[in-house]
Amino acid sequence: MFPEPAPPKSGDARPKSGGTWLTLVELAAMVGGRAEGDLDKHIAGVMSLAQAGPSDLGLLVDSRYSRAAGETAAGAILVSPNLEDMLDPAQSRVVVEDPRKTLPTVLEYFFSDPLPRPGLHETAIIAEDVKLGTGVSVGPYVVIEDNVVMGEGTTLHAHVVVRSGARLGRDVTLHPHVVVYPHVRLGDRVVLHAGVRVGVDGFGYAHSEGSLARIPHVGACIIGDDVEIGANSCVDRGSIGHTELGAHVKLDNLVHIGHNVTVGPRTVMAAQ
């Protein structure tokens, strides 16, 4: 198996991503919880109870997993007050009212990706009339066509294509091989994972003299603030009128949103 991270030495620096660690007391303070047990224990990551090692934080959110909590090698366990009595008294722990709500804060600390450096990669192809906000990061082999507007802090990873007339808000993240079709509008803090296509023509044909004539799709694809779309998903543009995803919508991988669909705010869809 993989070796456990070496415990830190006095004065060790703590990089924001990779090799991070916290003492149990520091971890409890970060999440507004109570530390019990070995208060100087160093925690360097989060893992399931079954797979955790001495430097990992485990998670107990349901009494069904009390046996796993008793057998775990985790250095400490994140637990709620009503489940705390299920732990061995010697088990180090961080006690919080709602471990599920606390978990994102812990995961972001230990596993957050390093921020990309602002700048334009030398292999990127960018039209002359593109308007880029401050702090934009454009990766290798990105293509940005004419009349595109991108807000500040936006990141385009390798091989992204942004077609003409698209509008991207602030702090948008497009992962590798995303394609944004013409005249798409992305709100602020939108995240599109690898292989996503937005603004694609919908599936529309008309019978004409024994053949099928393609119906042009001329509507927009409008995606609200804080939307996240999973890998290899597609969102079609409207035929006449728009396709719209409201703010805070979350789509799983391999989801297809057809033309002229309206998805309300805070909707969550799992893959089919």
Regions found by a protein language model. Give the residues of each.
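Structural signal for interior beta-strand "rungs" in well-ordered beta-sheet cores
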Residues: L59, G119-A271
